[in-house]
């Protein structure tokens, strides 16, 4: 086992604090509308330019192992906030640095670290209660756009685009962000249920120009197994022909004689039909077929459920206003499923999302949820160069996460005002134990850190801004760093999601509390290089 290097108390905290400061100072320059960019070297290709706090934090690795431990713990703050709220990573880092700094001073002055941590926790709980009380629900699409704009560093076009996408696909809908090949940033919205399986034969095409099969007011047969022959299906096929409506068959596969018969019928004009493979694999395929059955108001034909193909009637088939199938995708628009059934299924999938521990499963469940509940929107980010596209994509993703968080827990005044106003709630707290009270006071001071940093990044003295805001009685009065003006933050549209502010403070105080209570640090001792070998002796050349 390699030898270890151990540092204690003051020495350990000093090294750790140095690491915290290096990482936090690199991250905090990005805070606010006038935050600066950070350029990150890449081992290949052009460097990356970003204003995303967590991206900067993830790139920092320090040479000194003890300093690096401090930096990595603050990096964890940014990562955790990003995972939970998707934004607010820089605010969380600034708060963590402020709490650790003040905490380290208090410990150096001889206070009990455990009591300090208790005080920090009491104060944070009071702030969170205050934020929850102040949060107001997002009422309109324009408020969604404002949240997006603030998170995208004042880019109103991005805010507007996210609001448009959310309006179309609903709050449960899936919005993905991709890179665009052109200069423009655009939104592409898919209404209805879309899955990545196309027609099994090009002979099913009805629109030769677009190479798509478009079937209006269609019946949908959902079959769990492969279809090799159509003998068992004849009764239901005849009933569909008599109704004069088209039929879409979705099964594990349609092959051989079955596919040939369907193609011949389609070409002769006897039956408007198209066949598609079922989406997904294994258990997921079955679940997606059940989703389709609920969405279209039909039944999944499965022998497990005791339904045989020969017993299928037209009533068991699903219905949809329109089905569009191209070479690679199928879209079902306006399925005839009953709303209560769809809502029950959505509730079931939400419960599964909460229970699952696998990120992959969660992602797939969220996709299913979106397809059932709303739709899918894709924001394609464009730009003149690859570097610009990547930087813009970071901002779009931040803005998207912030708007989702706002819809969940409501909004509070932005620009660090919500935390600053929470000082009143913390100021009321008193504790007989002086060290616990000192912990409460640490949070009281740290609540000013984000607004000070936003002001300083805009070239304005932070303490003057804090003083001026606290003098004003209005709860929503704050500093608009973009225009260097004092305004009503909510009226001006400078708002933050309550969830982002709450998560940033919780994560920052959690890690900062651990750093403050650290008394020893253990790292691998640096290896001493072995002395170089003796050079070979001079020979007796030739003898």
From Swiss-Prot:
Gene Ontology MF annotations: ATP binding; ATP-dependent protein folding chaperone; isomerase activity; unfolded protein binding
Binding site for ATP: 30-33, 51, 87-91, 415, 496
Record GO biological process: chaperone cofactor-dependent protein refolding; protein refolding; response to heat
Name of the top EC class for this enzyme: isomerase
Record SUPFAM superfamilies: GroEL apical domain-like, GroEL equatorial domain-like, GroEL-intermediate domain like
Gene Ontology, cellular component aspect: GroEL-GroES complex
Catalytic activity: ATP + H2O + a folded polypeptide = ADP + phosphate + an unfolded polypeptide
Complex formation: Forms a cylinder of 14 subunits composed of two heptameric rings stacked back-to-back. Interacts with the co-chaperonin GroES.
NCBIfam families named in the record: GroEL (TIGR02348), PRK00013.1 (NF000592), PRK12849.1 (NF009487), PRK12850.1 (NF009488), PRK12851.1 (NF009489)
HAMAP family from the UniProt entry: CH60
Name of protein: Chaperonin GroEL 7
């Amino acid at each position: 086992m390699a030898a270890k290097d151990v540092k204690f108390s003051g020495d350990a905290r000093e090294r750790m604090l140095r690491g915290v400061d290096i990482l936090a100072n690199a991250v905090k320059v990005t805070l606010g509308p006038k935050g600066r960019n950070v350029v990150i070297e890449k081992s290949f290709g052009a460097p990356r330019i970003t204003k995303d706090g967590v991206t900067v934090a993830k790139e920092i690795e320090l040479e000194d192992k003890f300093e690096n431990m401090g930096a990595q713990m603050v990096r964890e703050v940014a990562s955790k906030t990003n995972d939970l709220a998707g934004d607010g990573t820089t605010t969380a880092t600034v708060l963590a640095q402020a709490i650790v700094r003040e905490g380290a001073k208090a410990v150096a002055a001889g206070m009990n670290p455990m009591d300090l941590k208790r005080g920090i926790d009491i104060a944070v709980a009071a702030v969170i209660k205050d934020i929850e009380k102040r949060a107001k629900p997002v009422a309109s699409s324009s408020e969604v756009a404002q949240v997006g704009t603030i998170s995208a560093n004042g880019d109103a076009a991005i805010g507007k685009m996210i609001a448009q996408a959310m309006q179309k696909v609903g709050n449960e809908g899936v919005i993905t962000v991709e890179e665009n090949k052109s200069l423009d940033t655009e939104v592409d919205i898919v209404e209805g249920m879309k899955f990545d399986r196309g027609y099994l034969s090009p002979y099913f095409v009805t629109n030769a120009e677009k190479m798509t099969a478009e079937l209006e007011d269609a019946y949908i047969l959902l079959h769990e197994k492969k279809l090799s022959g159509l003998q068992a299906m004849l009764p239901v096929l005849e009933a569909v022909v008599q109704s004069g409506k088209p039929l879409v068959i979705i099964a594990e596969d349609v092959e051989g004689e079955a596919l040939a018969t369907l193609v011949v019928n389609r070409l002769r004009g006897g039956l408007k039909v198209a066949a598609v493979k079922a989406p997904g694999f294994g258990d997921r395929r079955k679940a997606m077929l059940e989703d389709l059955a609920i969405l279209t108001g039909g039944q999944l034909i499965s022998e497990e459920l005791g339904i045989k193909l020969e017993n299928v009637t037209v009533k068991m088939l699903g219905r949809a206003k329109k089905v569009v199938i191209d070479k690679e995708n199928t879209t079902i628009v306006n399925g005839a499923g009953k709303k209560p059934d769809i809502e029950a299924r959505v509730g079931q999938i939400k419960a599964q999302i909460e229970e699952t521990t696998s990120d992959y499963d969660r992602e797939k469940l969220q996709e299913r949820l979106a397809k059932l509940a709303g739709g899918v929107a894709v924001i394609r980010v464009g730009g003149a160069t690859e570097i610009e596209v990547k930087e813009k994509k970071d901002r779009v993703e931040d803005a998207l996460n912030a708007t989702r968080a706002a819809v969940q827990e409501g909004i509070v005044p932005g620009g660090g005002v919500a935390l600053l106003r929470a000082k009143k709630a913390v100021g009321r707290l008193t504790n007989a134990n002086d060290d616990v009270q000192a912990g409460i006071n640490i949070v009281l001071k740290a609540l000013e850190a984000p607004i000070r940093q936003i002001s300083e990044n805009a070239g304005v003295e932070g303490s003057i801004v804090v003083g001026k805001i606290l003098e004003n009685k209005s709860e929503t009065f704050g500093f608009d760093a973009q225009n260097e003006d004092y305004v009503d933050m909510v009226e001006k549209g400078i708002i933050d999601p309550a969830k982002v502010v709450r998560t940033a403070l919780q994560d920052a105080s959690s890690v900062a509390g651990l750093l403050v209570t650290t008394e020893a640090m253990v790292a691998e001792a640096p290896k001493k290089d072995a002395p170089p070998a003796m050079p070979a002796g001079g020979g007796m050349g030739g003898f």
